[in-house]
């Protein structure tokens, strides 16, 4: 869902592009395996050098977009080697994450693969600037755009009204 606003914008502004959507987890794949907004939907292979190379040989991407916490080190390294424009959107960084640890050099190198990093907040931008990155733009969280879009299209459901009566109802999901 977090990448959906971007997919829809790309589809609208560049209808000639072929869009490949990948998932690593079965839960994400199962929810979106029939999504009509893209041309292809596949599982992403385990991130090994060989798998990254084979995947990119098959896909031939011109642009790669990662979302939030998606840092596939071998895939990123191969994208960079092939000079594929690569972006991350809705990324968020915290001071205690591996990128900012003394032993996080390999992970910091992965960040060099991104042409632009679109982060959620100023803190993330400052942390990355502290590592020497100036290709960072604060753009917020695409998830909020998607929630607003879903809320605007919400349908009235009689059974919910009957269930809650005149009381307020609070629903929480994916609350980890």
Please state what every model-predicted region is.
Residues 1, 163-176:
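Conserved donor-binding/catalytic core segment of Leloir-type glycosyltransferases
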Residues 1-153, 176:
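Active-site and donor-binding regions of nucleotide-sugar-utilizing enzymes
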């Amino acid at each position: 869902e977090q990448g959906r606003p971007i997919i829809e914008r790309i589809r609208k502004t560049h209808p000639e592009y072929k869009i490949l959507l990948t998932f690593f987890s079965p839960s994400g794949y199962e929810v979106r395996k029939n999504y009509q907004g893209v041309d292809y939907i596949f599982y992403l292979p385990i991130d090994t050098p060989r798998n990254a190379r084979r995947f990119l040989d098959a896909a031939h991407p011109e642009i790669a977009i990662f979302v939030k916490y998606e840092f596939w080190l071998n895939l990123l390294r191969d994208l960079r080697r092939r000079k594929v424009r690569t972006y991350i959107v809705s990324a968020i960084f915290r001071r205690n994450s591996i990128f900012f640890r003394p032993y996080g050099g390999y992970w910091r190198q992965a960040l060099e693969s991104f042409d632009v990093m679109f982060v959620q907040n100023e803190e993330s931008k400052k942390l990355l600037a502290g590592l020497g990155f100036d290709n960072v733009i604060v753009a917020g969280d695409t998830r909020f755009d998607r929630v607003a879009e879903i809320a605007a299209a919400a349908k009235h459901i009689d059974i919910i009204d009957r269930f809650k009566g005149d009381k307020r109802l609070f629903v929480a999901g994916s609350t980890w």
